[in-house]
Amino acid sequence: MTLVGFDTSTAATSACVLRGDGEAFEHVPAPGRLKEPPGHSRELLPAVADVMERAGVGWADVDGVAVGVGPGTFTGLRIGVASARGLATAARLPVYPVSSLAALAAGIDAALGLPLIDARRGELFAALFERGEQVVEPFAAPPHKLAERTGRQLAGAVAVGDGSLRFRQILEAAGVRVPPDGSELHVVR
């Protein structure tokens, strides 16, 4: 099964093709892109075209479209979901929704993973993963309420995503580990 996937839930636009032979081709923006204004309407379709060309596939070879469904910014999600529906409808393909928090968590190699997306207004979208399995459903909360909302001691957890970059000091003061700013772990892939 060959899939085209993309995510526009944060400021960074990411896209990929997963070919039926298991080989993946990604358009992963630089992590610094998370601190810039979003450009999804300009970046998404060229990114999809780029990964499809590098993968050597056309729409006739694709079996489905996967799209990040957040949580995230309203406009970003609207661009991503509308693009997925439009492309899939034109090619008569199914659309597969993917949690953006789960996609972030997939890159975490730690017992406790805390994917965080900046929800603005001093809050984060979060979920908690233990050894890759989601153990706390997605929620929104200010960073100082994460332990209370998850019902867990978060010291030693690894936090990724643009929310972890924005609230690094608060998280690290609570014993949460945050990869360096330039890490690709912070980009939804």
Which stretches of residues belong to each language-model region?
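Phosphate-handling active-site elements
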Residues: 55-60, 88-98
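DPxDG-like acidic metal-binding loop motif
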Residues: 66-94
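N-terminal beta-alpha supersecondary unit
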Residues: 1-69
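Active-site phosphate/pyrophosphate- and oxyanion-stabilizing loops and adjacent acidic/basic residues
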Residues: 49, 85, 102-103
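Surface "functional belts" at beta-alpha junctions
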Residues: 22-39, 94-188
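Short, conserved micro-motifs enriched in small and acidic residues
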Residues: 38-42, 74-78, 188-189
